[in-house]
Amino acid sequence: MVIQVYVEGGVINGNVDATTASNSEALREELNRFMQKALGREDVTIVVKKCAGYKNAVKEFINSEDIQSTYLYVDLDRVPELREDWFNSLVEDDISIPEDRKSRICFWIQEMEAWFLKQPQAIEDWASDEGYLRVAGQEAEIADHHSIAGKDIEHLQHKASDVLATILRQKFMLEPRNGKKLKLRYGKLRHAPGIIAHLSPAALIKRDSELERFCEKVKDQADDM
């Protein structure tokens, strides 16, 4: 069984430079690999389709012909209790999602980067493998950073991407060039693929109800075939 997942993120190949296009494809590939591992099923093939902005992803999802083989995975951009507000915001833009498709929509709450903050060791491992240098005085583990330690990641007051960017900027820097020390500045297309590659699907499922819901729904569908 083939499952197509329309996702927010990446760029549509066209008038973009080669590096951006390559990074965008790397993001799609890593999401594809991660979701496949999360499912743990050899009888299901995941095909992630990058759609740039979330509205474009929604439109592609709505216009897909085979309802049973398609899902949508996008940022909720708000706390989970305000899920209906996301649907209402689309109606305001004259985008209506058929009722029979709403159950096939899953969310990153509040953003995809929440996955990374829920599994800070993945960030540590990625930074180490990339050879980033630790800033002096910032030896404490990312898990103990005041912005996420002991907090519900899905209810952070600031965007997960901003929190991640702050953590990376405070804790890591690049190899000095021409005598200049450059702090690590987060870029989704540049850095997210590498962090995703270090995530543990089994561990993340236990901390992310939306990812768990996606996997269980696909598994149930496969079992019924």
Labelled PLM ranges:
Residues 2-16:
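Catalytic nucleophile-elbow at a beta strand-turn-alpha helix junction centered on a G-D-S/GDSL motif
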Residues 1-2, 17-48, 52-225:
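C-terminal accessory helical subdomains adjacent to catalytic cores in phosphodiester-
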